[in-house]
Regions:
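Conserved active-site alpha-helix within GNAT-family acetyltransferase domains
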Residues: 150, 175-193
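A short glycine-leucine-enriched loop at secondary-structure breakpoints
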Residues: 136, 145-152
């Protein structure tokens, strides 16, 4: 049995107000487990996001993301103010956050917080970009590695492009994060060797 996604009719426009989440689809995985795909993030989702970002036992998350600083120690409101559009995958029975993704304007090749210098961090809120939009995604235990992310992110991309059809998407991260970069490749992203940072082992991939 393959994953199936059943869209929920809606007429939402972006950006959504802060702490707003609307169901846009039902996701049923290959084992028959049901999830809600949410556009936006309400306070319940953000609370889970913060808790998971602070979980130091999740070494994959801590080693490969800036979420401990971004969501655990930082302001969600400030992050959202940068034009971010979040999507959440929420397990229906337990209401647990299974995966989280976001899009938003960001200059091509601009690294995440984990890789920025102090001077670059001070400029983070002053970026002006319209053409290139970043895509970032996370999956959380115990749902990581269960075959959910490809279909979830593919659906999120299609939804986001309805609102921003001219946007060029890019992803970036640790070149050794085979799962994340492999997913990007399966989604049609292509590596940009000219943006590879050998010192920080950071790479970018684009989908134009």
């Amino acid at each position: 049995m393959a994953n199936t996604i059943t869209p929920t009719p809606h007429q939402l426009s972006l950006p959504l107000p802060l702490y707003t989440a609307e169901k846009i689809a039902t996701f049923t995985d290959s084992r028959g487990e049901s999830f809600d795909i949410m556009l936006g993030a309400d306070e319940s989702i953000v609370q889970q996001l913060r808790k998971k970002s602070l979980d130091t036992t999740d070494t994959d998350l801590q080693d490969n993301t800036s979420d401990f600083k971004r969501f655990g120690g930082g302001s969600y409101e400030e992050w959202y103010s940068k034009g971010r559009t979040p999507f959440a995958l929420v397990h229906q029975a337990s209401v647990a956050l299974a995966a989280f993704a976001w899009f938003g304007p960001k200059p091509l090749g601009r690294k995440s917080l984990k890789y920025l210098s102090e001077a670059e961090l001070k400029e983070e809120l002053n970026q002006k970009e319209k053409t290139w939009h970043t895509l970032v995604y996370r999956s959380y235990l115990p749902y990581r590695g269960k075959g959910l992310m490809g279909d979830f992110i593919r659906f999120a991309i299609a939804e986001y492009r309805k609102h921003y059809p001219e946007a060029k998407l890019w992803v970036g991260g640790n070149a050794d994060n085979a799962a994340s970069m492999g997913l990007a490749e399966r989604l049609g992203f292509k590596r940009r060797d000219d943006l590879f940072d050998a010192e920080k082992n950071w790479m970018a991939m684009v989908q134009e």
